[in-house]
Regions:
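A residue-level signal for alpha-helical anchor/packing sites in multi-pass solute transporters
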Residues: 43-47, 131-132, 136, 194, ...
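Small-residue hotspots at the loop-to-helix junctions and early N-terminal turns
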Residues: 48, 52-59, 147, 301-309
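Short, Lys/Arg-rich, polar N-terminal cytosolic tail immediately upstream
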Residues: 1-15
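Helix-loop-helix hairpins in multi-pass membrane proteins, especially solute transporters
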Residues: 75, 79-208
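Hydrophobic alpha-helix/TM-entry signal in multi-pass membrane transporters
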Residues: 19-26, 88, 95, 111, ...
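Hydrophobic transmembrane-helix bundles of small-molecule transporters
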Residues: 169-278
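12-transmembrane solute porter fold
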Residues: 19-36, 40-42, 61-63, 70-74, ...
């Protein structure tokens, strides 16, 4: 092969500083979001026990996931409208602030508020990272980014619960939430450089942003109300909040999914329905197994973490 062809191939294969910075920041941020989503599952029985609020277990476990899914729906439209910079930094701030609030929360209600903010930030910060891949990474390197992102989602499920269980046993559950914001700050450093190299995008029309935000907010609120119903004292309050949550979810969710999803229409709708059913069973088991092992069988947080893994 001629020397000039070899050097040209090497130039195409080499990584730019912006690509390296984006890879470091994005992988670390996704790892942190996935870690907090999975690690909290293991230690949540200890958290609600410390507040003497066992009835709040469902909402404490699910608030972050509900708000994360709601934020993910609107993050793409927001990134198109305002650019990825604002959405990414807003997501990082909300994610870190939510973790700090959860770590220092004096009551279970404040803890749930922190969890909701954490999920909101996690949903906002992930989508702009995919947008930045298109702006920064060369087509040759984009598959590497997507493979690294997949690993960043999977790896915390293998080691996160065990780490969280051990930290909770040795130092307490507060550290599982309180230490992660420091890593968010570290992850923000390379991405600041990356965003300086990305030209400001032209503002686009906010296509369906208002309707997406409304439907996502109502769907997330409905799911949170379904979880909150079990924490209320009176049966009448439980029934009323459950009915309201079910009505909001039933109204908003079909508007966020392809038509025919709940009728299992052939093609994408049936594929999404299959994913919904699989995720529902997986999340339900992941939430309940630690509770059963720790409350019924008196397992420690570290021991039950291995079964979650």
């Amino acid at each position: 092969m001629p020397a000039d062809a070899t050097s040209s191939s090497h130039a195409r294969a080499s990584w730019t500083p912006a690509e390296i910075g984006l890879a470091i920041s994005s992988v670390l941020l996704i790892t942190l979001v996935a870690f907090e989503e999975l690690a909290a599952t293991t230690i949540m029985p200890a958290v609600v026990a410390s507040f003497d609020a066992a009835a709040w277990y469902p909402v404490a476990s699910g608030a972050a996931l509900a708000t994360q899914l709601s934020a993910t729906v609107v993050a793409g439209a927001l990134a198109d409208w305002k650019g990825p910079r604002l959405v990414l930094f807003g997501g990082m701030v909300l994610f870190a602030v939510g973790l700090v609030i959860s770590a220092v929360a004096p009551t279970i209600i404040i803890f749930v508020v922190g969890r909701a903010l954490q999920g909101l930030g996690g949903g906002l910060l992930v989508v702009p990272l995919y947008v930045l891949i298109g702006a920064v990474a060369s087509p040759r390197h984009r598959p590497v980014f997507f493979a690294a992102f997949s690993l960043a989602w999977v790896l915390p499920s293998l080691v996160g619960p065990a780490i969280a269980g051990h930290v909770t046993e040795v130092w307490g559950w507060h550290y599982v939430f309180g230490v992660v914001p420091l890593f968010v700050v570290i992850a923000a450093v390379p991405v600041v450089y990356v965003l300086r190299t990305v030209p400001a995008s032209e503002a686009r029309k906010a296509v369906r942003l208002a309707s997406l935000a409304r439907d996502a907010l109502l769907a997330g609120l409905g799911v949170v109300l379904l979880q909150l119903a079990g924490a209320l004292a009176s049966s009448l309050s439980q029934l009323g909040i459950f009915a309201l949550g079910a009505a909001l979810t039933a109204w908003a969710l079909p508007r966020l999914l392809p038509r025919g999803t709940f009728r299992s229409r052939a093609g994408m709708p049936s594929a999404i329905l299959a994913r919904l059913c699989a995720m529902a069973s997986q999340v339900g088991l992941a939430v309940m197994i630690p509770l059963v092992l720790q409350r019924v069988h008196s397992w420690s947080e570290a021991s039950s973490a291995w079964w979650v893994t």
